A protein has these predicted regions:
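Conserved glycine-bearing catalytic or ligand-binding loops at nucleotide- and phosphate-handling centers
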Residues: 122-140
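Thiamine diphosphate
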Residues: 6-11, 15, 20-29, 43-45, ...
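Short, glycine-rich nucleotide/cofactor-binding loops
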Residues: 41, 63-66
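Catalytic phosphate/nucleotide-handling subdomain of diverse soluble enzymes
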Residues: 48, 59-63, 72-76
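Flexible inter-domain linker/hinge segments
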Residues: 1-5
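Active-site cofactor/substrate anionic-group-binding motifs, chiefly glycine-
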Residues: 34-46, 59
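Conserved G/P- and acidic residue-centered "switch" motifs that form tight phosphate/ATP-binding loops
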Residues: 56
Length: 273
């Protein structure tokens, strides 16, 4: 992120009082005038970003997944409807462990993928996240881009080139596993296992890939009613796909505090980690 800010002086990062807990302190010291804490007001933050983008600037918004829902109206009316190029760094996507039910980021994927013109990315590790940041900086946008990443530490390393998807394993058979985000890195691999770095819109050949398999398993740190699982089911219906779609998801519940891996095991992923 520091390299991006150094090479692009017109990029500003806004955050509604969430920099402190997210490792941005060194960047705030180096780029004090370009990392703007807008206070605890998510809707105001997003509308401010819309104004900066409308004036020709390049705003990025850093915000926790669980608090992004407070700005849903502004995302639709002030950014998506206006086709403004705003990058959202959606921090703490998925289960966050000890922060508990107020901070689990399990709702945003369901509503983000229903916004016209939105693009949604979910990296499987820190290297892919770095590549996404570089791609977001270089790519011309005509709507919001959401990069969803978990509360976690990474060992660093070189960024990987951005690709919409990656085959983690491909060995024949009639079953396809589709996963996204950090789950792709954490879980056991299926005999045919596709990681979707770009959750939405689906890449061009995804329909053809689905048609090659009789049973589709979708893995997601969400309720599975919308989001990736819902979109896969809808696409299969459009294709008149005769196979089954089996979702591996979280329950519709406010999940308690606890270590992230423990919570995943207790809420639907016990045999997959």
């Amino acid at each position: 992120m520091g390299a991006i800010l150094e090479s692009h002086s017109n990029i500003q990062i806004l955050s509604p009082a969430m920099f402190a807990g997210s490792g941005f302190a060194p960047l705030r010291e180096r780029f004090a005038n370009r990392l703007i804490d807008t206070g605890i007001n998510e809707a105001h933050t997003v509308t401010t970003a819309a104004g900066i983008a409308a004036a020709g600037g390049r705003p990025w918004v850093h915000i926790y997944s669980t608090f992004l829902q407070r700005a849903f109206d502004q995302i639709i009316h002030d950014i998506a409807l206006q086709q403004l190029p705003v990058v959202f760094l959606v921090d703490r996507a998925g289960l966050v462990g000890s922060d508990g039910p107020t901070h689990h980021g399990v709702f945003d994927s369901d509503f983000l993928m229903n916004i016209p013109g939105a693009t949604v990315w979910s990296p499987q590790n820190g290297n892919e996240l770095q590549g996404m940041l570089l791609e977001a900086e270089a790519r011309p946008l005509d709507g919001p881009l959401f990069i969803r990443y978990p509360k976690a530490r990474t060992q660093g390393g070189a960024p990987t080139d951005f690709h919409t998807h990656e085959w983690l394993q491909k060995s024949g058979g009639s079953s396809l596993w589709v996963s996204t985000g950090a789950l792709s890195d954490l879980m056991k691999k299926g005999e045919n296992h596709l990681h979707l770095a770009q959750n939405w819109p689906f890449f061009d050949d995804f329909s053809a890939i689905l048609s090659d398999f009789e049973e589709i398993h979708v893995f997601e740190e969400s309720t599975g009613l919308g989001g990736l699982a819902g979109a896969v089911k809808a696409l299969m219906a459009e294709l008149d796909h005769s196979g089954k779609c089996i979702t591996h998801k979280l329950p519709i519940a406010f999940i308690e505090h606890g270590p992230r891996l423990q919570l995943l095991r207790e809420h639907g992923f016990n045999n997959l980690l």
